[in-house]
């Protein structure tokens, strides 16, 4: 299956999950959730869930609820990341951000509800109960104190500081990398894959996440609003140190290339059919948006 075919299936599944009764569908909260969740995007995280499930010997269709769950979780993080108390951004995917359209209170609640729905979607799936539990545990770990929320906290309290590369990596491995690691490992868990598969999937996700963040930092300085669909230069305006600040453009390009090559090598330690994931890693390393 191609990346575009995966995206079409994921978008259709997300829309199906949010076919709500009329009494709920017209509420401001439901409209706020749908506004961000169904706004498009690359769908990288759910794609990773489905593909890792496939190459670990599972049925990707059975893992679709898990894939949708991680996209709900990711969408919640974007809504909250854009809030005035965080990055205070007004544009996301070429559209006004959630709080600009629906207000800060509704946007906050939309994110909260999407997080709850993510776990409910996993636990209501048709996967064997032990696989549901494993996926939920992986996702919870990726979001909590040692994961995405902990990374966002460090990002806020260290704002304006001169960060070392190690400190910057600590922020980004939690804030960005943890959810990508979770996507890969949840796919394996949904398939009932081995510990070796889980380990290799985690190493792939960590390298992919770091490369993704470095490329993001590059685009924040090199791209345009029209191309990215979100503000550029916001890191500099908020006095946040980035990989571009620490490594420069050449250093960033070199590091992204090294991480991408590592991510592809590590897959071969536990999986055979890795062509799609290798192509995805290559594509993300040179993405323009």
Locate the predicted segments by residue:
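Mg2+-dependent prenyl diphosphate-binding active-site environment of isoprenoid biosynthetic enzymes
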Residues: 22-267, 271, 275-285
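N-terminal amphipathic/basic leader segments beginning at the initiator methionine
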Residues: 1-20
